[in-house]
Amino acid sequence: MGDSLSPEEKLSLITRNLQEVLGEEKLKEILKERELKVYWGTATTGKPHVAYFVPMSKIADFLKAGCEVTILFADLHAYLDNMKAPWDVLELRTSYYENVIKAMLESIGVPLEKLRFIKGTDYQLSKEYTLDVYRLSSVVTQHDAKKAGAEVVKQVEHPLLSGLLYPGLQALDEEYLKVDAQFGGVDQRKIFTFAEKYLPALGYSKRIHLMNPMVPGLTGSKMSSSEEESKIDLLDRKEDVKKKLKKAFCEPGNVENNGVLAFIRHVLFPLKSEFVILRDEKWGGNKTYTAYLDLEKDFADEVVHPGDLKNSVEVALNKLLDPIREKFNTPALKKLSSAAYPDPSKQKPAVKGPAKNSEPEEVIPSRLDIRVGKVISVDKHPDADSLYVEKIDVGEAEPRTVVSGLVQFVPKEELQDRLVVVLCNLKPQKMRGVKSQGMLLCASVEGVNRKVEPLDPPAGSAPGERVFVKGYEKGQPDEELKPKKKVFEKLQADFKISDEYIAQWKQTNFMTKMGSVSCKSLKGGNIS
């Protein structure tokens, strides 16, 4: 296909869906004369997850544009980065990566014979490369080396020398792989600019750098191999995919920090050029979107329900994962997977003294700062028909701004001056441009006629009074819940409305000093 494209068409394919390009003019000049040589490298650390489909889809674009593409399995980098891959499993993890990356490429129809695969240690241990590492270390400052790796190399209080070497080796890879361009995530930008600064100091040319956006995880933060709850593994079973998507942050009408929408935008749309929302005929039937922004708008306007969005992603994702699961269902690859990533629970613990602060944090209700609030004012969100912007007195000097998706469920007059229950220690986040400083907790019942009701504090409660689960009233709430730790999400899984309309956690009542928290009519409902 590349032979039949003009330089402009090749440029469009190479740069589509990228967040940033450094050296675009040089890229244009090369495309006028010959095919681009580009490489993508991946350190063989944690198990690859579904966000790896983002670079895979770009590799498909590069091949369509006629590029000569190299995939580097950066095994030495995996060890240098605070030994994320211990030396004794380094070779096994590299083999795992090679097999799983090839399976991913095959699942999206990329011909493997057009790619060059190489391991870092195939050339990084040579005399010439080692000498260049020493040459580079003589001109690079400690400050620049640490700054370059800040977004990629694990940050610790006392950095190891190996982590400071990491950016320099990645820069040298561009020369030793004989490429025109390096492709990676925007989190690599500081390493890319480091390479642009220091390669010329060794007499080597500055390369082009192509950067794709980072995909938020299911919790709204960056999707990470080291955060189990934030990502879907390529070998996760269908039931695990369903479970993780069910827990994913996907608030009605909220397109900010929405990991499910982000996955559609950055993974599913580039691969298929369309996305189908699967839903019952009574809700309008299936709908096909050929432009992501149309889907985002419908979600923001609550035309598309989070449940339908998650179910549709589940179906599309499993179609991508099925060929990979099938390939890894052989005895040889099962054995490789177990050896490369041994189950920590089956490993014998090392005999050491007690570690400081080694006990895991308890996920208990007292960590939530839940208070009685009084709604001072209610207005429609200026940019979202489905959202209210409320000012709520929670016993502080100033009322808090809280954004909630209640327009379709609760009339404005019913909220005005009402006592409500507010979760106050979530990390503030923007919802369609307005920063929300809390969550108004509600009961809800899903189904044909979805119903939502704010929780009611007991009569006589006052703004600022603490809401607690009986038996956990003495614990101290976290100052701010860290999104990565998912404390609220883990506790919320056991929130329920009892048959007596009482809000409960694990069948234990939510209370204030005046009595139990309740809702008007939604027995058996969920709480969010």
Curated annotation (Swiss-Prot):
Pfam families in UniProt: tRNA-synt_1b, tRNA_bind
UniProt keyword annotations, A-Z: Acetylation, Aminoacyl-tRNA synthetase, ATP-binding, Cytoplasm, Ligase, Nucleotide-binding, Nucleus, Phosphoprotein, Protein biosynthesis, RNA-binding, tRNA-binding
Region named Disordered: 338-362
E.C. numbers: 6.1.1.1
GO BP field: tyrosyl-tRNA aminoacylation
Motif range ('HIGH' region): 44-52
A GO CC term assigned to this protein in UniProt: cytosol
PTM sites of type N-acetylglycine: G2
Family: Belongs to the class-I aminoacyl-tRNA synthetase family.
Identification of the protein by name: Tyrosine--tRNA ligase, cytoplasmic
